Amino acid sequence: MGLLTFRDVAVEFSLEEWEHLEPAQKNLYQDVMLENYRNLVSLGLVVSKPDLITFLEQRKEPWNVKSEETVAIQPDVFSHYNKDLLTEHCTEASFQKVISRRHGSCDLENLHLRKRWKREECEGHNGCYDEKTFKYDQFDESSVESLFHQQILSSCAKSYNFDQYRKVFTHSSLLNQQEEIDIWGKHHIYDKTSVLFRQVSTLNSYRNVFIGEKNYHCNNSEKTLNQSSSPKNHQENYFLEKQYKCKEFEEVFLQSMHGQEKQEQSYKCNKCVEVCTQSLKHIQHQTIHIRENSYSYNKYDKDLSQSSNLRKQIIHNEEKPYKCEKCGDSLNHSLHLTQHQIIPTEEKPCKWKECGKVFNLNCSLYLTKQQQIDTGENLYKCKACSKSFTRSSNLIVHQRIHTGEKPYKCKECGKAFRCSSYLTKHKRIHTGEKPYKCKECGKAFNRSSCLTQHQTTHTGEKLYKCKVCSKSYARSSNLIMHQRVHTGEKPYKCKECGKVFSRSSCLTQHRKIHTGENLYKCKVCAKPFTCFSNLIVHERIHTGEKPYKCKECGKAFPYSSHLIRHHRIHTGEKPYKCKACSKSFSDSSGLTVHRRTHTGEKPYTCKECGKAFSYSSDVIQHRRIHTGQRPYKCEECGKAFNYRSYLTTHQRSHTGERPYKCEECGKAFNSRSYLTTHRRRHTGERPYKCDECGKAFSYRSYLTTHRRSHSGERPYKCEECGKAFNSRSYLIAHQRSHTREKL
């Protein structure tokens, strides 16, 4: 068996068959072809890139390859589409065209290698395939290398006479399509060992084993190698700890040239007794069974002899005929089954040295993809958001987020999706199918992700940890929502009123206020709620129920959130930090209110006078000025206040308590605000400045009174004579004049 070529793993479609494929199936075809090509590249089996791969990477139709003038020449990279174009009339012309393009006016007889080669015409060879013999006077391996790398001699069968051993090697590059002979045609024969080789580069490497030429050194295994292409292949095989040994000569080779023997793993064909030592050759072998039969496809009423057509039938019927014997999973493609079966259940033999990631699949393709992620090589990048992907198909699906395209539509409800897998999952809602079952409790789920999340309830594992507060979650979505508590992000905005929310579910519930849909009303006060749980919590206000109790101090709360905030008093935790000044708070509402000191936002407005406030509590207290309400009454003297803080400060006048002391002069005060304003006498600070005249004051009340001199406002009116004043102190002083008159 020869070296695996791109043609061996390529899938062919006729033009008629290609036109019947859906866009998703074409994308699948392109991904499979590109992935097969990358597999060959990772194993060092491809010399240069086929035309078909170039077109597929540019997301062009494969049939556009036929419109190109340039024809692929070398057989191991020969495009199976361009091959059809090489008829007897065009082969010689195409060959001459390639020669002239690369070497100017030089013809076949005047190549730059002619100093080392003698050209002898072989008699009896006519037609397109011009058989020529080259006698090698002085062997130079670099000449052979350049000869084949330039792809000059690929279209004609050649013979090479090696003077040192007087052995003749023949090479044929074109496949006789009518007779279906082997793609490689004639073999290279090395008489000294009677071993057949498929390509001259392999012959040269084998020759070097006997000659003893070893020019390339491997740093990993301290081995010396025979050819320039060997180090790459050797390092890959050394990395995977796989070597192939020739039993006849007991020489170790890094390419599978002769009898292959894989030490770690083998792949057995389900349809015959064939055992392959490489996954790619196992895939190649399976195509033999497909080509041996002809499948009848009733939908198009034609016989299909290619595996691609059989796959089309399977796609139409939604069949999954390939079943895994180990886990019972069914797949619609033999390739998928093969890849699925070679995944070990426990061991992870492949580890990428850059990031330390371990892979289940013992294949260099997965290491190549991880290398692309780490190094940024060969990634497909989105032009809209610069996000990168290792597969072009993933990029195409991602771009639908920006374009809004949703090509996959549900026939039951008409809902559309941008990805076929989303549609498959959605269909389970209608069918009730739940293929993912928990082994612990037997509960079934329609998505594998739901099963994975459910299994954490049994293990108690919480993989997702917050970097700010170290809180852990079983679901990544819960962590994302939690992180918005720290960042203050509220991405969900109501189009009706502009209110923002941190969760989409909260926005959905809020919208019901505007639509009036399914509102839950309190039987006591008729207050409506969009969520039933919110109604239950609200009813505790009327019942006085406080089910959440603090274990530290025994204090009870009607809401769990209040208990959580209360716990932070005991722990001293302040997880909410202001980015502007680094001040921390124990609850998110405190941070939200604090931010308004930086932004100057005042969202709460008094309906009576239009005055705006940063805090809702301030506007509530302010309204009491208009209503005259003073709900806070001193039990000692009966004096009432419209602020609770005023009552607290007043009560200290009865107790004599003065907890706030000035460090400069030792003077004590019964209010924190009094101490703050007192300190300005020592510092000379006057933070309150008039916008009209620029005059500054050390007290806010002084600035408020001063502004009334500009506006003419006099809110304090004497009930005796009707005289008005702009300051309360002026009114009090004026009222004393009336009391003196009475005395």
Curated annotation (Swiss-Prot):
KRAB domain segment(s): 4-75
GO molecular function terms listed in the Swiss-Prot or TrEMBL record: DNA binding; zinc ion binding
Gene Ontology cellular component list: nucleus
Keywords: DNA-binding, Isopeptide bond, Metal-binding, Nucleus, Repeat, Transcription, Transcription regulation, Ubl conjugation, Zinc, Zinc-finger
CDD domains: KRAB_A-box
Span of zinc fingers (C2H2-type): 267-289, 322-340, 380-402, 408-430, 436-458, 464-486, 492-514, 520-542, 548-570, 576-598, 604-626, 632-654, 660-682, 688-710, 716-738
Linked residues for Glycyl lysine isopeptide (Lys-Gly) (interchain with G-Cter in SUMO2): 66, 135
Keyword S-adenosyl-L-methionine: no
Protein name: Zinc finger protein 267
InterPro entries tied to this protein: KRAB, KRAB_dom_sf, Znf_C2H2_sf, Znf_C2H2_type
Main location: nucleus
Subcellular location: Nucleus
One Pfam family in the UniProt entry: KRAB
Family membership noted in the UniProt record: Belongs to the krueppel C2H2-type zinc-finger protein family.
GO biological process: regulation of transcription by RNA polymerase II
The protein's role, per its UniProt record: May be involved in transcriptional regulation.
